[in-house]
Amino acid sequence: MSDNPPRMEVCPYCKKPFKRLKSHLPYCKMVGPTIPTDQKVYQSKPATLPRAKKMKGPIKDLIKAEGKELETENEERNSKLMMDKPEQTVKTFPLPAVGLERATTTKADKDIKNPIQPSFKMLKNTKPKTTFQEETKAQFYTSEKTSPKRELAEDLPKSGESRCNPLEAGASLLVGSIEPSLSNQDRKYSSTLPNDVQTTSGDLKLDKIDPQRQELLVKLLDVPTGDCHISPKNVSDGVKRVRTLLSNERDSKGRDHLSGVPTDVAVTETPEKNTESLILSLKMSSLGKIQVMEKQEKGLTLGVETCGSKGNAEKSMSATGEQEWTVMSHGCENFNTRDSVTEKESQGERPHLSLLIPRETTYEFHSVSQSSSQSLASLATIFLQEKKAEARNHNRVPDVKALMESPEGQLSLEPKSDSQFQASHTGCQSPVCSAQRHTPQSPFTNHAAAAGRKTLRSCVGLEWFPELYPGYLGLGVLPGKPQCWNAMARKPQLNSPQGERLLQVSLLERSSTHIRSLEPPTGLTTSNFSLMRLLGAVQKGWIRCNTTIRKSGFGGITMLSTGYFVLCCSWSFRRLKKLCRPLPWKSTVPPSVGVAKTTGDCRSKTCLD
């Protein structure tokens, strides 16, 4: 005690001096009075072990309780599914519980929070199975996630099944709509797949299914596509067989009619939609091929025969190919087979109407379906616009009038069948009709009269602007030219006193002086004429500058005001000069000097007193 400095007390337990021993004693009493100083650090760890054991015990109990609950749920679900499913699917359910127990017991010793997460994940993964089984009656199996049937149904439209033989396609399509055949397929798939793929535990991943999936996809690609060049009778017979098989299978669901059909091309998801789409595609392809066969046999009559029936048959073949691809992409929703049939019949009855249809329409048969919902009046106006656009391209407007007056044109204007107007509507796909959309449309009965009234009103004021006349004819409002315009109105001749014509004067200069040009000016000289041309050039340049700067906001307003000021000054200058010309100039000479001023023919003298 005497060796230590003052105010230092030695702890009786740890033998260390402290300034405040009372604050240190509670900590030393917990260690114990008989513990040496060397072993203090090593003995502190066993003191925390009881706390860890107390924390780990309840967690294990919770994990075991959750595992038991999952086992009971799996047993209840298995007991419910025993009434509705075969035996081989029941064996797949107890596996998730075993995998869950292993996962929870192994992870419980390592971490405190991690064992709870797999249990919730397994609950989320196992519950949607029952809801999915309640929704679909045909797919009432737990092996849907493990067997590659579901993936095959998703990848089947991409493999190009609709292009193969229609009998094989219809038969393979019927496999997905029959419940007993699905059970047989499940047995075949379960026999071919290994056991680790059939399990539905939480440790299952997609990389185990990918090899089997790739093999099945290779099998799908190796399926023979069949002969695409089928006679129309065989195609129609195939469609009838598919329909009869569908009706028989819907009536008797318990019987298995297709036991020998290969299961590699089975469709299990949404069978009804696939049947409808496939039947529509088969109808479309059969009708297109029938049309091609009939066209090759009969050929196109009259002037189309000179063009060649083989080329048209090839075009129709390409058109049917495009129709097949459009049907495959759009799901056979906007296609109407009745339009193609009526078009074929109308071409057989009245072949001379095909001369009015452009040749490019054969490549655009897929756009005919979009015009099926339009009315007859709108289609007639579109037909008129097409004819006007063709005449405007060749600058032969009177030919359209002659066509309208001819009996063939009247037959083409009459709304006899939808296919005629649809075929004519396809010709409007050219860029010429895009500009024609801005023209005013009216019913085709009163179209010419309304256009004539508009022409009579709009031609007023355009008589002295011959450069606008070709553009006015290009509008195509009337099939003929305006009647109020004559040769003098097309080429107005403005003669100046000097004998030169003003036909080459700019449009803006003529618009500013068209009133004065009607009556030739009396006092117009060479200097004045050059001044007027200069003013016209300034005005033209000002308008060009104004159009470019008008978009700049405040600067455009200022330029506009200055331009008006300049125009007013030029007008007042010309008026004042004309008024002041006959008057004599006043002399500003001193009175002591006599000056004689001559201005033109007028002379005046100032005399001194």
Curated annotation (Swiss-Prot):
Residues 146-161 have a biased composition (Basic and acidic residues). It comes from Pongo abelii. One of its GO terms (cellular component) is mitochondrial nucleoid. It is a single-pass type I membrane protein. The keyword Transferase does not apply. Keywords: Membrane, Mitochondrion, Mitochondrion inner membrane, Mitochondrion nucleoid, Transmembrane, Transmembrane helix. Critical regulator of mitochondrial DNA (mtDNA) abundance. Binds dsDNA throughout the mitochondrial genome without sequence specificity and controls mtDNA copy number by promoting its replication. Also plays important roles in mitochondrial metabolism and cell proliferation. Residues 1-554 are extracellular. Residues 572-609 are cytoplasmic. The keyword Transmembrane helix applies. This is Mitochondrial nucleoid-associated protein 1. It is found in: Mitochondrion inner membrane; Mitochondrion matrix, Mitochondrion nucleoid. The chain crosses the membrane at residues 555-571. Disulfide bonds: none annotated. It comes from the Eukaryota. Residues 133-163, 406-425 are annotated as: Disordered.
